[in-house]
């Protein structure tokens, strides 16, 4: 009897596993903490489906959704017109949450620092190479800056976090825009590469004098300091939910939802913020998976948004949320 029970239980588990639908996605590391939370929680709501998300960077997510090797991609940089033209069908940008890119560093005592855009540009151009540079000292009176070499750390993979960062640098510096420009991957003038937000944070944590950029939650998780950045209104702003929300509120959001949030006009807006998108085809080629994907998207925008703040992301404003829900209704399966 015991063996029979064991066999029946095993068969039941196997049947459940076989019945569970797998939906694959890939892309940005920037939203990985909240996406993994969403997928875990949604598995309890609908056990018939499991979402498998590979956090490989926005560039990889865009490539895989274009190749249709995943059901959805994820990116912190909107797809270019050129890439959208390569898609075998109409691709939709579904905004999910917004977050902050932060300048993080590894210094003795890890003091709180303030920096303006031109100073950050010159660090990443390799023009400022030591921590006691006068431009840093002038913005941080009373802070003892060490006589220490800077080690710039940037992303080595195609990255939406990079897209937000260099979009900001291009906006505040014509030299950066001309020499380096925008994109999910650029030719860096200086520095070491790290794979993913995790890789950059890991390098900064290990290297004295290191400086780089990561999404806010990765700095917090790794107990790394991050600087206040001077915004377009002339105020030094701490990155956080309120300052990112103000940045999103100041952004102009077009019908296709491809927009930039960097360097907005708000008095309290953090200047290096960005939205992140799920990329899905309007016409789903697998009707069953398409239906499950749409059900998840509706849940994420309606219920999942409430989880954003706990992970240091800014949820969509109500007016944007309603527009996104209307766009999800256009997905066909």
Regions found by a protein language model. Give the residues of each.
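Positively charged n-region of N-terminal signal peptides that target proteins for export
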Residues: 1-4
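Cleavable N-terminal signal peptides
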Residues: 6-7, 17
């Amino acid at each position: 009897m015991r063996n029979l029970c064991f066999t029946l239980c095993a068969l039941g588990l196997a049947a459940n596993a076989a019945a569970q639908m797998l939906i694959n996605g890939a892309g940005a590391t920037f939203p990985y903490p909240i996406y993994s939370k969403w997928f875990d929680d949604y598995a309890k709501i609908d056990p018939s489906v499991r979402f498998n998300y590979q956090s490989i960077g926005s560039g990889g997510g865009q490539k895989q959704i274009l190749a249709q090797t995943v059901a959805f991609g994820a990116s912190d940089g909107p797809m270019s017109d050129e890439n959208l033209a390569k898609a075998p069908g109409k691709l939709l940008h579904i905004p999910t949450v917004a977050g902050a890119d932060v300048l993080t560093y590894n210094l003795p005592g890890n003091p709180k620092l303030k920096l303006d855009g031109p100073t950050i540009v010159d660090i990443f151009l390799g023009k400022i190479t030591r921590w006691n540079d006068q431009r840093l000292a002038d913005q941080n009176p009373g802070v003892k800056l060490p006589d220490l070499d800077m080690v710039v750390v940037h992303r080595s993979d195609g990255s939406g976090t990079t897209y937000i960062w260099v979009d900001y640098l291009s906006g505040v510096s014509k030299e950066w825009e001309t020499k380096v420009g925008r994109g999910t991957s650029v030719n860096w003038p200086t520095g070491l590469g790290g794979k993913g937000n995790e890789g950059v944070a890991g390098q900064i944590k290990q290297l004295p004098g290191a400086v780089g950029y990561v999404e806010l939650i990765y700095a917090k998780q790794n107990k790394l300091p991050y600087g206040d950045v001077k915004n377009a209104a002339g105020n030094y702003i701490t990155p956080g939910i309120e300052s990112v929300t103000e940045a999103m509120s100041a952004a102009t959001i077009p019908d296709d939802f491809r927009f930039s949030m960097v360097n907005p006009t708000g008095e309290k807006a953090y200047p290096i913020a960005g939205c992140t998108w799920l990329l899905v085809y309007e016409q789903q080629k697998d009707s069953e998976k398409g239906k499950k994907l749409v059900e998840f998207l509706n849940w994420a925008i309606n219920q999942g948004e409430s989880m954003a703040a706990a992970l240091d992301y800014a949820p969509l404003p109500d007016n944007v949320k309603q527009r996104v829900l209307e766009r999800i209704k256009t997905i066909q399966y």
